[in-house]
Amino acid sequence: VYKRQGVQDTTFTTLQFCYENHNEVPTVMHETLLKLFATYIVVGGMPDVVQTYVDTHDIGKVVRLQRNILELYRQDISKYSEGAEKVRIKAIFDSIASQLDDKNRRFILNRIDENGRMNRYENSFMWLSDAGVALPSYNVTEPQAPLQLNEKRNLFKLFMGDTGLLCASCMENIQFELLQGNMDVNMGSILENVFAQSIKSGGFSLNYFESKKYGELDFVIQNGLKIDLLEIKSGNDYQKHSALNKVSAVENWKFGRKIVFCKGNVEQKEEIEYFPWYMVMFYQREKEPEHYIYEVDLSDL
């Protein structure tokens, strides 16, 4: 998306160097990229929408096209599902934005069906996930590997597969606030969604951790054998992260990287790395060794 808007390869080279070496991004470049990131949130990644923006730079046209796509999604749900299943899928889809807007962002089934049972809705969530329309992030009992064995499948957040579509599904015209740089606490759900989208597209599974004792970590990511902790901060107080501090202090828990994505510039304080939001593009899977030779010594047999 950035390249489609004319960002040069030399800029990406500079950014990658800053990311890998914990160097500050030049101020003018940093401020411009924050604006481009806000544009990416609003426009999203749907090819036709991106092309419309590149051709016209008309946010009104972008939003109208996004709302047409949302309507096409609803038509697809009607076309490719039947009966009660169709009703459930539509109810889930239409509630994603409002559920994310809640304080803890967790998907609460009884908000769409007072007598609903998760086992009756499981296939509906799977339908939306398999279609790439929605991205579930599951809570874990503890932020340790292997995360898949620690998942609590009945506790999850449900993100929209494309953040531009999430913005378009919010009827308050928040696009203009975002483009003005007003990424305050009320935009936290939008910001968290774009990170879920980016992390998932990087090939990672989505998990989070929440407990009364430690608080909540936005993303707990299994990266190879290590567990990375990611916090997404929308405000100016991004160096306040009590849950991250508490979890990091648990003696028996071992972690890889501890990253805070924020509006600030690149910085490292002890073991916590601070990166601007737009640098999520450089957060990638650990490279696996090309060869791993293992042979048992049989000489003692």
What kind of feature is each model-predicted range?
Residues G264-L301:
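Domain-level recognition of nuclease-like catalytic cores that cleave nucleotide substrates
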